Structure formats: structure tokens, C-alpha cells
């Protein structure tokens, strides 16, 4: 639907007494512009019911008029007589226009881009990224090519991952990670793939998309479960091997004994094949909002792997810091069976505007002004739940009555309701602490406003990343004063003291609830630490005590003092089975205190380093590109910034850089016996073909060729290739030469078929590049080519025989 069509529908709706047959069509569009229009309708309906929503409506009206570049007539309506929103009206009921009317302290260019929904996409070299027949048919022939070469590398790398391996895949937001999940789930017949998703909203979103793409033939083929739903249905479907793809929350796996036991059993009899963890950086995310159940997943996974050593694990996220990678490898890899597919890239939609204030009152006034003038939907990040409540109260005083608060104090039921309303465009101001964000996949957030300084560049970037997920420009503003820097630095003092760490650890270790074995200790975390004021030793702990006790165990695990072999949740408390790696922590003496002191010092150093990196960057605003800070955190990303206080335009290090950030060589494919038979035990085979290559491609892919390389301008009818080989990769020569620069055996191994036609120059280059490679090479040509640079026929240079296609066909038919 075009902008003109949308504005015509909206204008008609207002003129026809709030009714329009075409409004239903608009509601089904599911586009950024249709969302803007529907928010206008929703807030007007609110206003008509209660005049207290007049400010909310006029804010939505400003966003609508500026985004569409239009004007509107609303019968019998009179705008507020202020300059809150830059609205101008020709008398009551007259035509309404909007002007930007932006304050001088904001970057007007960035604001305009966000209002106008400017597409922000990096320039890319076009690659020939054909789907293989398996994916083509699995997705019901909806696509013939991958979305991008990044998606192809991610999906094919995942599909080729051997049993028993863990694959970490870094791929940019919006790049199409979901296709990896779908293809893995259906790669092996009668198998189960479990996807661990951080939030219910993201779980439901992924479930709906999977059903839309896959179109399952049985009702239980794709399922999801979270607390409160019918657990019998899921457990029975697992037991009866009916599910192919199951979406779960980490809390379900840790806390629901029936679901966990059914998964462990499914692993034991080989039905449970793949464990996928989405937003995997949260698994080891540290700080005040760490997710205990996410951090305990590796212990449950150990039990699953014990039952099925062939279980594959996949860790997906858009970005990983070096520390996160190290921790994930330590906790999730077995016997060195680890592969990284790194397609890391900084976001191209984010524009940064850092605004320093002189006083608290100036900052407060600016926040109110920014909420009025910046594009919506807007997420306003604050430091604490009290700050969130105070800001909401301030907004209500000036007339905004349709905002929501999402903090660590928000209960689960209310969280679910808020997220549903947020995604359904029922409101457009979200006031949040760091508890909000991950997995809330609202695509059209136009502004992320930070009113505090986060604890690290990583946390800050993750919060900024809630915006612009539709690929359109997003403004990331931060307004701060010097007091905010002091508040950020005060976080360093929140690290547990040696006394408290020691007190919590030895209170748990020496509790009568703890069971000690020869090599293991079963620890009950519901123990009150003996340093607690007025506490009786070993009395029941409250929720805060349990959380801090878990924190200490996880901290010791991170320091490699112990490993967590199992984790369970019984009667509201976490029970850990741990293996002690450093036996010095079993004794409450000076040695143990020194060890704990060193852990505390390292924890303090890490927190201090993160905070100083961000606060130091604030001092350089305008002199240094803001995004260089992110390159320091995400070390494999190239320099890219869509705009900041130093520059308005795009700043990038390399143009059209190949997206694979490091070689992928953890394993190699083996050549099938049929292909070995065809090439007669040699490394290469030259096949002379008359006419189309397609019949030979079909036969050789059936025989087990792993990769087909075709000219970039060659069209290929995927529907005519009938192999069910899920690992088959089809690429163009541009991609092949990029992959050949380094050892990428995950993609270039086994047997590779090169379609060369009559191109002798290309043949000469291929012979040079593939010389002495470990994979088998089969060359398809129309005639024995003259290799000018070598002054020989191609058949003389190939380390193998030269055969006519009809001879090969006889051996294959």
C-alpha cells in the first residue's frame, strides 16, 4: 500500500465519522507506515473516550503528518494552543499541518531521517546465493535465493555442523536467523529441535513465522510452551515424537520438571537432535539484571549431552563481545567440538546524538521537550524503577497519559500485557530500565532515549539496538549531566565484598541442606548468609538472598573454581550439583579468602573498565566517532557509523567488505563413495558436456556433490534439481574466490563442482586457486579449453581423467 493510499484512508476515516471500509485493509498491512497510521487511529479513539489523552493524540498526529509529509482535516477538532508538537491549524476544524520546530541542541538531520523512515542499508556486492532444493521445498517454494550472502553462510554453516558440535553464529539483526532454525528442525526425519527464546513475545513471533513459512501438515509439528499453558499437550507430543520444532523459555527448561525430564528422555533415545539458544549473549550476561535461568542452561545441556553425545548446540545472536565468546566456549563446547560463524556487523540504522546538560532541571525540561519533538515509538531508558515512576508522573503532569513502565519490579503477567500492547501499537512511549529489551522484537521503534549512563558499552549498544529493527533510520539520543557520570561510577561499589562473598559461599557449603560427595557437592541456595544482621544461621533465605547466592556460585563458575554439573528448581529454590575444581574453596581459611579476594578484584576491574570506557567516550563526544567504542567491544566488526556528533554522514572503514569476519575451518566434509568412484580415486575430473549443464548437475548432486559453483550471471532452475541433500551449497564465483582467500573448509570441502562453460580465463584462475586443495574438484566444460597462460589444454593440467558426459551419465543412471 502506497503512502497516498494510506493518507486517503485516514482522511476518509476522519471525514466519515470514524468509519471506513478500507481501514481493515490498512490494519492487515504490517508495515512501518501502516503502524504510524494505526497509532493515530488508536490514540484518537482513546481521546474520544477520554479527553485526558489529547496530548497523546496530538503527539501521534505530529508523527503521522511529518512521516507522511501530509496535512489533514479533522472535523470539529481544535489543537492545543501551545508549540508542543509544531502543529498549525486554520481555525477549528481547519486543515492541520506539522512543522519540525526542533530544539537547537538536537541534530535535526538525524531527527528528520527517523521521521521520514529513511531506509538504511549498507552497499552490498550482489552474490549468487541460491537456495538448495531442500530449503526451496521446505519453505514451500516461496524463495529461490537467500536474503543475502550472510544468510547463506549462516544457514549452510549451521546445516553442515557435525553431530556433537556447538556452533556459535553471529549475524546482524534482520539478517534472517530464523531460517537456520527452520532448516535445522527438518534436516533429519523424526527429530526434535528445541529453541530457547528469552521472552514470550519473541517466542510467539517466531512460532507464527515458522508456521507461515513451513506450513506444517500436522497440528503438533511446531509448538511452543510457557508457564500457564497446557503442559500435558507438550509432554505427550514429545513422548509420541510428534514435534519437529519446539519453542521454550529458559525458565521452562529449568523450572518445569515434566518438560525437562521429557527432553532428557528424548535425548536419551536419540529423538532430540538440536538445541538452539536465541539471543545467546544473555546466557553469560552479567550485571544487575542477569537472567539466572539463562545462566543455568549449560548445566541442563550437560545432562542432555550425557544422554545424547550427538546433540548439536547452536548459539545465535547479533553481536558477541570477546568475553562473551570466551565464556560461551568454556561452558558450551565439548572436546573441542566448537565452530564460530562470525558475520558480525555494526547496525546501519542507528544515528547517535549525545546531549550534555548543565543542571538537573535543564535535563528534566529537555526530556519533556524531546518526548514531544522526537519521532515515536520511543523507548526512554532510565536507571532505576523509581526513576521510571518519577518520569511517568512528570509526563502525566504535562498531559501524556498513555505511557507504560517496564522495570525489574513489573510482574510477569503485567510484562506480558505491556509487550502485547506495545507490539499492537496501543501506546508509543515505553519508559524502561535495563530489564526491558531483549527479545522484544518491535520493528518500528524510531527513537531510543537514554536518560542515564549504562554500565557498559555492550549494555548501551544492546539497548540502542531496540530501535530501527525494520531497517529504517533510528535516533539514539542520550541526555546526561555530570551527576549521571558519578551515578555510573557508583556501580563499582556494588560488587560484593570479600566478606559477603565468603559468607554466602561457606554458609551454603556448610549448611545441613548441603550434601557432599567425593567429587561433587549438592548445594541448596535457600540458605541465609551468616553475616546477615539479626539472622539465625541456616534459616530460610528470601528471594534476594537466593539470587545473590546463585550470583556467587555463577561467579565462582566464571572464575573456573567449580563447574555446574546439574541445576534444578525445587520449591522456589535453585539446587546446584557442582564439581569443585579448586579444593581450596572447601576450607574457610586465609587461602580461600585470598582466592575470593582475587575474584572480587577481577570483577571490580571488569566493571570499572566497562564504566570508564563509556564515561571516557562521553568526554570525547564531537571529537571522536562515537561508534569506535563499539569496535573496541565487538572486535570483529568493521568501522561503521551512520552518524554521530562528530559527523552527519556515514563513516565506514571498508566498502563492500565480505561479511565473513574470520575463517570457518573447524571441520571438513567428506567426499561420498559415489563421487570417489566417478573420479576414480584422483583429485580432479574434467567432464566435457554437450548442451546444457543442468542434466549433469542434477546427476552429480544426487551422487553427493557438496558444493556447486556457477557463473554469477547464470540462472539455475532449483525446482529441477531433486536432491534432498540439505548440506548442498550453490554459490557464484565471486563468493567462491572470497572464501578461497583463507581456509574455509566448512564451506569448501568434500567435493566441489565447477561450471566453467567456455570461459578459459576463468578456468585458468580456478586451476590456480584450487591447486593442492584437499577437496575433490569436478569441472564442467563444453570443450577441452586452451589455458593460454600455461600453453596447454585443460585436460593436460587436471590431475585426473577427462571424460565425455555420456560416459559419466552411464555410471550414474
What are these regions (language model features)?
Residues 714, 736-739, 754-768:
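Glycoside hydrolase catalytic-domain context in secreted enzymes
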Residues 1-316, 321-347, 359, 368-376, ...:
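N-terminal helicase ATP-binding lobe
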Amino acid at each position: 500500500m502506497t503512502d497516498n493510499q494510506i493518507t486517503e484512508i485516514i482522511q476518509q476515516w476522519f471525514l466519515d465519522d470514524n468509519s471506513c471500509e478500507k481501514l481493515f485493509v490498512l490494519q492487515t498491512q504490517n508495515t512501518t507506515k501502516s503502524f504510524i497510521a494505526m497509532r493515530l487511529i488508536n490514540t484518537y479513539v482513546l481521546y474520544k473516550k477520554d479527553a485526558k489523552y489529547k496530548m497523546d493524540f496530538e503527539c501521534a498526529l505530529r508523527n503521522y503528518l511529518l512521516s507522511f509529509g501530509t496535512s489533514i482535516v479533522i472535523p470539529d477538532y481544535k489543537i492545543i494552543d501551545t508549540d508542543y508538537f509544531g502543529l498549525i491549524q486554520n481555525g477549528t476544524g481547519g486543515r492541520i499541518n506539522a512543522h519540525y520546530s526542533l530544539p537547537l541542541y538536537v541534530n535535526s538531520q538525524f531527527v528528520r531521517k527517523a521521521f521520514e523512515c529513511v531506509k538504511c542499508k549498507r552497499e552490498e556486492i550482489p552474490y549468487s546465493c541460491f537456495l538448495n532444493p531442500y530449503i526451496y521445498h521446505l519453505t514451500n517454494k516461496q524463495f529461490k535465493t537467500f536474503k543475502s550472502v550472510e544468510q547463506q553462510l549462516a544457514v549452510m554453516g549451521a546445516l553442515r555442523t557435525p553431530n556433537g558440535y556447538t556452533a556459535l553464529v553471529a549475524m546482524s539483526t534482520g539478517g534472517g536467523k530464523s531460517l537456520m532454525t527452520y532448516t535445522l528442525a527438518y534436516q533429519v526425519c523424526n527429530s526434535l529441535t528445541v529453541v530457547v527464546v528469552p521472552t514470550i513475545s519473541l517466542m510467539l513471533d517466531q512460532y507464527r513465522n515458522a508456521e507461515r513459512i513451513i506450513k506444517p501438515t500436522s497440528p503438533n509439528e511446531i509448538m511452543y510452551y510457557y508457564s500457564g499453558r497446557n503442559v500435558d499437550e507438550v509432554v505427550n507430543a514429545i513422548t509420541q515424537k510428534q514435534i519437529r520444532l519446539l519453542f521454550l523459555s529458559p525458565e521452562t527448561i529449568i523450572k518445569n520438571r515434566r518438560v525437562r525430564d521429557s527432553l532428557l528422555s528424548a535425548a536419551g533415545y536419540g529423538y532430540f537432535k538440536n538445541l538452539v539458544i536465541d539471543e545467546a549473549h544473555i546466557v553469560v550476561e552479567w550485571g544487575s539484571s542477569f537472567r539466572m535461568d539463562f545462566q543455568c542452561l549449560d548445566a541442563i545441556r550437560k545432562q542432555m549431552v550425557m544422554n545424547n553425545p550427538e546433540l548439536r548446540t547452536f548459539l545465535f545472536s547479533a553481536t558477541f563481545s570477546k568475553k562473551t565468546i570466551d565464556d560461551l566456549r568454556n561452558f558450551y563446547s565439548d572436546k573441542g567440538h566448537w565452530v564460530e560463524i562470525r558475520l558480525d556487523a555494526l547496525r546501519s540504522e542507528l544515528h547517535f546524538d549525545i546531549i550534555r546538560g548543565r543542571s538537573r532541571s535543564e535535563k528534566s525540561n529537555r526530556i519533556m521537550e524531546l518526548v514531544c519533538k522526537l519521532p515515536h515509538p520511543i523507548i526512554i531508558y532510565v536507571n532505576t524503577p523509581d526513576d521510571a515512576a518519577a518520569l511517568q508522573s512528570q509526563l502525566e503532569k504535562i498531559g501524556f497519559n498513555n505511557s507504560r513502565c517496564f522495570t525489574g519490579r513489573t510482574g510477569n503477567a503485567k510484562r506480558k500485557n505491556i509487550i502485547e500492547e506495545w507490539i499492537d501499537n496501543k501506546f508509543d512511549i515505553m519508559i524502561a530500565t535495563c530489564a526491558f529489551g531483549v527479545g522484544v522484537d518491535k520493528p518500528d521503534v524510531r527513537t531510543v532515549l537514554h536518560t542515564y549512563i549504562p554500565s557498559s558499552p555492550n549494555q548501551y549498544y544492546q539497548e540502542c539496538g531496540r530501535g530501527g529493527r525494520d531497517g529504517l533510520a533510528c535516533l539514539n539520543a542520550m541526555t546526561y549531566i555530570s551527576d549521571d557520570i558519578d551515578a555510573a561510577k557508583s556501580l563499582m561499589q556494588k560488587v560484593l565484598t570479600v566478606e559477603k562473598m565468603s559468607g554466602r559461599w561457606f554458609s551454603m557449603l556448610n549448611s545441613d541442606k548441603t550434601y557432599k560427595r567425593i567429587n561433587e557437592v549438592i548445594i541448596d541456595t535457600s540458605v541465609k548468609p551468616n553475616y546477615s544482621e539479626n539472622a539465625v544461621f541456616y534459616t530460610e533465605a528470601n528471594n534476594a538472598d537466593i539470587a545473590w547466592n546463585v550470583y556467587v556460585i555463577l561467579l565462582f563458575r566464571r572464575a573456573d573454581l567449580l563447574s555446574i554439573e546439574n541445576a534444578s528448581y525445587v520449591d522456589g529454590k535453585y539446587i546446584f550439583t557442582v564439581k569443585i575444581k579448586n579444593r581450596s574453596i572447601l576450607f574457610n581459611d586465609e587461602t580461600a579468602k585470598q582466592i575470593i579476594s582475587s575474584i572480587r578484584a577481577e570483577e571490580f576491574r571488569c566493571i570499572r573498565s566497562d564504566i570508564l570506557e563509556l564515561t571516557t567516550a562521553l568526554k570525547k563526544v564531537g571529537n571522536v566517532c562515537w561508534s569506535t567504542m563499539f569496535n573496541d567491544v565487538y572486535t570483529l566488526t568493521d568501522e561503521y557509523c551512520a552518524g554521530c556528533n562528530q559527523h552527519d554522514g556515514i563513516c565506514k572503514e571498508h566498502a563492500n567488505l565480505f561479511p565473513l569476519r574470520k575463517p570457518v575451518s573447524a571441520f571438513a566434509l567428506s567426499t561420498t563413495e559415489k563421487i570417489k568412484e566417478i573420479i576414480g580415486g584422483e583429485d580432479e575430473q574434467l567432464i566435457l558436456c554437450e548442451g546444457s549443464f543442468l542434466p549433469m548437475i542434477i546427476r552429480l548432486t544426487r551422487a553427493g556433490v557438496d558444493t556447486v559453483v556457477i557463473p554469477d550471471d547464470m540462472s539455475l532452475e532449483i525446482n529441477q534439481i531433486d536432491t534432498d541433500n540439505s548440506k548442498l551449497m550453490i554459490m557464484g564465483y565471486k563468493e567462491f574466490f572470497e572464501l578461497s582467500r583463507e581456509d574455509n573448509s566448512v564451506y569448501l570441502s568434500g567435493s566441489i563442482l565447477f561450471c566453467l562453460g567456455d570461459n578459459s580465463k576463468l578456468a585458468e584462475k580456478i586451476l590456480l586457486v584450487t591447486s593442492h586443495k584437499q577437496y575433490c574438484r569436478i569441472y564442467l566444460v563444453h570443450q577441452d579449453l586452451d589455458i593460454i597462460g600455461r600453453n596447454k589444454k585443460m585436460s593436460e593440467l587436471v590431475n585426473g581423467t577427462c571424460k565425455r558426459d555420456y560416459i559419466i551419465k552411464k555410471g550414474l543412471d
